[in-house]
Regions:
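Active-site recognition of the HExxH zinc-binding catalytic motif
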Residues: 137-151, 173
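Hydrophobic, aromatic-lined core segments that form the binding pocket/scaffold
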Residues: 116-118, 147, 171
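Conserved binding/catalytic microenvironments
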Residues: 119, 126-127, 143, 151, ...
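Post-HExxH zinc-binding segment in Zn-dependent metallohydrolases
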Residues: 159-187
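Cysteine-nucleophile amide-bond enzymes
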Residues: 19-23, 29, 73-74, 78-82, ...
């Protein structure tokens, strides 16, 4: 398992060649069975193009404690692995979080842009000072989605009815809430 921290500093350094840099990084995480198969869609989902439009000072203000976050992610993975099998090739990519305009009045909402694109790839938008308990819960939820034996990988866009989506989300919620504190802001 690997963790990539696509930090504000890295994005700032890659700014002159950002499109090529993001294309290479994101495209390497996409396969023919990914939910999102276009690197620009992933970059847009995580507002990376918008982030690149910020000034250097604004970009760096979104920095987080990389060592602490790596430790939290590693510990969370170990906890989850006691209960479910995870893909050994799993790649967790952390990117800077920008607020969504429709939840701008809820501080915690900035940490809810998370996506499992395939059993080998989880993306998390992370704010500078995340609530660690909430981050653990959120990551456990996504790790549940990423488990290679999860029936989600039998679903396609053609056979993914709403009731299956509710089951998928509900089981991931139940699983993560059994392991970590309930810090959900939407409950």
């Amino acid at each position: 398992m690997n963790i990539i921290q696509l930090t504000p500093q890295l994005l700032l350094e890659s700014k002159p060649n950002a499109e090529a840099y993001l294309n290479e990084l994101i495209d390497s995480t996409i396969t023919s069975t990914s939910w999102m198969t276009n690197w620009q869609d992933v970059a847009s989902r995580f507002q990376l193009f918008k982030f690149l439009d910020l000034s250097a000072e604004e970009m760096l203000s979104h920095s987080w404690n990389e060592e602490m976050i790596a430790q939290v992610v590693s510990e969370t993975i170990k906890t989850v692995e006691k209960h479910i099998e995870l893909n050994q090739d799993l790649l967790i990519t952390l990117v800077p979080a920008l607020p969504f305009p429709w939840f701008s009045n809820i501080e915690q909402s900035i940490l809810t842009n998370v996506f499992t694109n395939i059993s080998q790839s989880i993306w998390i938008a992370i704010p500078p000072n995340p609530d660690i308990s909430f981050l653990r819960y959120l990551l456990a939820h996504e790790l549940h989605h990423s488990a290679p034996n999860n029936p989600i990988y039998e679903l396609t866009l053609d056979n993914f009815p709403l009731n299956n989506w509710y089951k998928m989300e509900g089981t991931a919620e139940y699983f993560s809430l059994q392991l970590f504190d309930d810090k959900r802001w939407w409950k």
